[in-house]
A protein has these predicted regions:
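NAD(P)-dependent short-chain dehydrogenase/reductase
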Residues: 50-100, 106-107
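Catalytic helix-loop patch of NAD(P)-dependent Rossmann-fold dehydrogenases
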Residues: 4, 8, 17-58, 62-63
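Amphipathic terminal alpha-helices
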Residues: 187-203
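Substrate-binding strand-loop-helix patch
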Residues: 66-67, 91-100, 120-138, 193
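Residue-level signal for the nucleotide or nucleotide-sugar donor/cofactor binding architecture
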Residues: 36, 93-96, 126, 171, ...
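A hydrophobic C-terminal alpha-helical subdomain
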Residues: 157-179, 184
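Mid/C-terminal beta-alpha module of Rossmann-like enzyme folds, strongest
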Residues: 111-162
Length: 203
């Protein structure tokens, strides 16, 4: 359909297409080996999108925002209910603010970057436990949380999930940065923005 209209197809994919055994950030040319059905379905989506003459496949990871269900909102919700939270500390990735991703997608279309696969994620890598620490630290500074819960680091084996996550899924953003001539936004700077927007929604 996109080819019939002469349109650009933008497909958002995920870090789940990798198996997580790397020791350095994944580039777009790394071999793909999804760990489960979810990752395999995302890889099939990439293959379908790549059939379009003009396509951009953008892999991202650990997306959070003031909307929908995501890690930041879950932490705030369960943190208000419990004195202690156990958070996985041996999975490493790069949180990505949905607003930054949306802005990057618009810029990619405006600048007519070459067809292909790109990575976009939110800057410095961290564990889920470190991400949670940053969320509650900021929430306390913003006056949203008076006493944050105790955060206890645990292993992946102690917290199984239906869709198996890659242990290490840090994405190398350099190809897209070069194409756009910009640097990736820092996910930690987006946390206070999201908290403020959540406060306005609840007001």
């Amino acid at each position: 359909a996109a080819d019939t209209l002469g349109a650009l197809l933008i497909h958002v994919s995920t870090d789940y297409v990798f198996n997580g055994t790397a020791t350095k950030p994944y580039t777009e040319s790394e071999s793909l080996a999804p760990l489960g059905a979810y990752g395999a379905s995302k890889l099939e989506g990439e293959k379908s999108a790549a059939k379009a003459r003009r396509h951009l496949i953008v892999r991202t990871a650990w997306v959070f925002s003031e909307y929908g269900n995501n890690f930041l909102k879950t932490m705030l919700r369960v943190g208000a209910e419990r004195d202690e939270l156990k958070v996985v500390a041996d999975q490493i990735g790069t949180p990505t603010y949905a607003g930054d991703l949306a802005a990057a997608l618009l810029l990619m279309a405006e600048k007519s970057v070459p067809t292909g696969i790109y990575h976009f994620s939110g800057g410095l890598p961290c564990s889920w436990w470190e991400f949670a620490e940053a969320i509650f630290r900021c929430a306390q500074q913003e006056g949203i949380v008076s006493v944050p819960p105790k955060l206890t680091p645990i292993t992946t084996d102690e917290y199984p999930t239906p869709a198996k996550r890659p242990q290490y899924s840090v994405l190398d953003n350099s190809k897209l940065q070069s194409a756009l001539g910009t640097h990736t936004a820092d996910w930690s700077l987006a946390i206070p923005l999201v908290l403020k927007k959540l406060g306005l929604q609840q007001a």
